[in-house]
A protein has these predicted regions:
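Helix-biased detector of long, well-ordered alpha-helical tracts
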Residues: 1-236
Length: 236
């Protein structure tokens, strides 16, 4: 890897850190066979303003801020099967911060908010349901599944992480009659995925409208219910 490529990597990282309102305060170098780049975040947060993946309440409305399918797209890219349009979409989604969604969210009553990353939508939903002592109903038709990712899922082109996520969460999921390829995408590990918000029903419509102004891909995907025993997630 030449010096100009390294320079571009560092510049891109700096620009995103600056966009998030933070600063680069140091660094270190790792020698290895493959180039890697990452960031560790250190900061302070008022304990009364912490949002975790627990705290969702029955009646809450579930909002999701990004489409699903990034893991499948990046797997297809490694196999040199991804279209130029798919690559551009993946890059745009992965380089879009959750800052705008977060800035909108803090003005409303949001009871829980994991980011959807390596465990996929169903993995993080399962953790939220367990941690909150509730169950979730997800409307699969309302979830923005990336069309090209869905086609790859139908072909069986899936990341290894999808299978691990399925093993983890599937015992707690009632998939109903949902098509298998759509289930696969719901387990797809996301890189730089969106936020999954459990919103007080009195605030849900107003927050949803505000999110649509700054996060066009925002979706209203389900509801939180009282836990009745048994499964935690119900796909409809």
């Amino acid at each position: 890897m030449d010096a100009s490529t390294v320079q571009e990597l560092l510049r891109g990282g700096y620009e995103k850190v600056y966009e998030a309102g933070a600063i680069i305060a140091g660094g270190h170098t790792i020698h290895g066979a493959e180039p890697i780049y990452g960031l560790a975040v250190t900061g302070f947060l008022h304990p009364d303003r912490v949002l975790t993946n627990a705290g969702a309440r029955p009646g809450d409305v579930l909002l999701l801020t990004k489409p699903i399918g990034i893991g499948v797209l990046t797997t297809a890219q490694k196999a040199e099967m991804l279209s130029p349009e798919g690559q551009a979409l993946a890059e745009r989604l992965m380089t879009t911060l959750n800052k705008s969604a977060r800035d909108a969210m803090v003005r409303y009553r949001v009871h829980a908010c994991p980011d959807v990353t390596g465990f996929g939508l169903l993995g993080h939903s399962f953790e939220m349901a367990q941690g909150s002592g509730v169950e979730l109903e997800l409307n699969v038709d309302a979830i923005d599944l990336i069309p090209e990712a869905l086609e790859f899922a139908r072909m069986g082109l899936l990341p290894a992480g999808m299978y691990r996520n399925r093993t983890f969460a599937e015992p707690g999921v009632d998939a109903g009659v949902i098509e298998l390829c759509k289930q696969d995408l719901l387990y797809d590990p996301q890189t730089a995925g969106g936020l999954l918000m459990a919103v007080d029903p009195a605030d849900a419509e107003a927050l949803y409208r505000e999110l649509q102004g700054c996060v066009p891909s925002a979706q209203r995907i389900g509801t939180v219910r009282e836990y009745r025993g048994g499964k935690r997630i119900f796909l409809r």
